[in-house]
Amino acid sequence: MDRVTRYPILGIPQAHRGTGLVLDGDTSYTYHLVCMGPEASGWGQDEPQTWPTDHRAQQGVQRQGVSYSVHAYTGQPSPRGLHSENREDEGWQVYRLGARDAHQGRPTWALRPEDGEDKEMKTYRLDAGDADPRRLCDLERERWAVIQGQAVRKSSTVATLQGTPDHGDPRTPGPPRSTPLEENVVDREQIDFLAARQQFLSLEQANKGAPHSSPARGTPAGTTPGASQAPKAFNKPHLANGHVVPIKPQVKGVVREENKVRAVPTWASVQVVDDPGSLASVESPGTPKETPIEREIRLAQEREADLREQRGLRQATDHQELVEIPTRPLLTKLSLITAPRRERGRPSLYVQRDIVQETQREEDHRREGLHVGRASTPDWVSEGPQPGLRRALSSDSILSPAPDARAADPAPEVRKVNRIPPDAYQPYLSPGTPQLEFSAFGAFGKPSSLSTAEAKAATSPKATMSPRHLSESSGKPLSTKQEASKPPRGCPQANRGVVRWEYFRLRPLRFRAPDEPQQAQVPHVWGWEVAGAPALRLQKSQSSDLLERERESVLRREQEVAEERRNALFPEVFSPTPDENSDQNSRSSSQASGITGSYSVSESPFFSPIHLHSNVAWTVEDPVDSAPPGQRKKEQWYAGINPSDGINSEVLEAIRVTRHKNAMAERWESRIYASEEDD
């Protein structure tokens, strides 16, 4: 293709055989007209140069008396070995093959000078009118040799055309002569990119096993060297220089290619000039030719192999290489092998570590302290698997005085806690309660007629407590039946954890201990018990029962001390109400101690309130118990004063502020939604 005019040089109609040629790279060829005097007549190495007579006549047509031979150089500097550097001294003149005449189909061809050369250059134009038919035949032969010389090898070595006498028409296929130009050296194929891409993919699949074998071996061995390497399944017409060339059947195409190559006359035989710039040597005739993409793949793979050898890496066996990065696990105790991929809901490693430690702590607690005092499983279940009820965070495992039922498998030494002995609780318990009896099994208040099977069930390590034990501090369900079966204590029975208002009522001090002794607790029979099974008992844990009794005794003691103090200070004020059982008890107790009626202690100078108020009798009215409880709830507290308290009622009425309401708001509250004026 001409660089300036963009016309295909090979589009000349006479050159229809050369249309399959591909022109590598820059298709503008530079021709040096080398001076061929009689002293420079021997161009061949061995044979002398002899010109035919009509050729000498053709030389006479040209204006200088020297003979010219054509050298073709493809897009690179001229070989330094052939010519000296001084162009002007030797009188070289550079010409370019004009493509315009060739494209217009004229039988003549022109040698045009390049633009950048000296002004000394002369333009030689060989017109058809100047030459006779014999000269035209010679010119045609020369032009055909030039076109043949343009089929240069891909390794961009220089092909020099050298003349030898031959009169035969080059188009007539004579006996093929052996020339240095083999058909696998000449690359005549136009690049078909779709075919090349498919060939590239098939090469990749073929070379997966051995990636460093040269890609040329992946081509089928049956393809003839002259034939195109594009897949033959595509019967589209080939593109040659932008023109569609119909593909002949394959065998004929191969024969034509052979004729085209081997029918070069000997005076236009192509000789490969050794160029120091050209790297690739002549390929051996056995290897099939290589497409450009294959060559790029091969070079890239060789480059990668060289880099691997330099850096000491082993050969890549596969395209997907797995690189192992040595890591150190964060937590060596946790085995994360079961969950290799992190799920979204999975906790972090530290949370997992805490969970593991908590579970371990629960296990140790359960191993240490499955004690008798809890809800023991019946012994007909005790052979089965242990129920999943945990006792992890309760203080009962520490406070329980029972011996370790599972001392056979000891817990870690760190988690062993010294138990608080039950004798330490004894001074704090109320004097009316009997001494704590701790049987060998640690069951509180258990009847001595307990059978050995039930004792075994009580001491079995399977005994666990319901997880509701934290809300029920005594370990007993808060039911009225259970409270009814409980023996009455000295103070009115309250819901546990709730301080009743009766604790702070002003009453005289009682000094009477409860008469009846502490009864053993009657076990309650629940409705869900199996008929054939032994009774499933819910028993209080000893430690929680100790805490409960201590709390009740402390409350009772506080109440008694408060009443004693009030009674000593203001004896006339507090007249007990006769309607309560506890008040009858307290009155009888105060009568028994001889503190009845009004009295004043005038001897002691420290009781000044009694001196002041000794002659005045104040009475405190208890809240009216006859009112239903719903009505008492309706009375609102005002300014922090309980309206059910009879003392403060007058003060409350005195300081109560009447609400100032809008008239419309009052009508709205009295459900008068429309005024009379609107009607």
Swiss-Prot record:
One of its GO terms (molecular function) is actin filament binding. Residues 153-163, 472-482 have a biased composition (Polar residues). Changing S382A: Almost complete loss of CDK1 phosphorylation in vitro, loss of PLK1-binding, no effect on cortical localization. It comes from the Eukaryota. Residues 360-371, 557-567 have a biased composition (Basic and acidic residues). GO terms for biological process: cell division; cell migration; establishment of centrosome localization; establishment of mitotic spindle orientation; mitotic spindle assembly; organelle localization; regulation of protein localization to cell cortex. Keywords: Actin-binding, Cell cycle, Cell division, Cell junction, Coiled coil, Cytoplasm, Cytoskeleton, Mitosis, Phosphoprotein. It is found in: Cell junction, Focal adhesion; Cytoplasm, Cytoskeleton; Cytoplasm, Cell cortex. Residues 401-411, 583-593 have a biased composition (Low complexity). Plays a role in mitotic spindle orientation and mitotic progression. Regulates the distribution of dynactin at the cell cortex in a PLK1-dependent manner, thus stabilizing cortical and astral microtubule attachments required for proper mitotic spindle positioning. May link microtubules to the actin cytospkeleton and focal adhesions. May be required for directed cell migration and centrosome orientation. May also be necessary for proper stacking of the Golgi apparatus. Associates with F-actin. Interacts with DCTN1; this interaction regulates DCTN1 distribution at the cell cortex. Interacts with PTK2/FAK and MAPRE1. This is Mitotic interactor and substrate of PLK1.
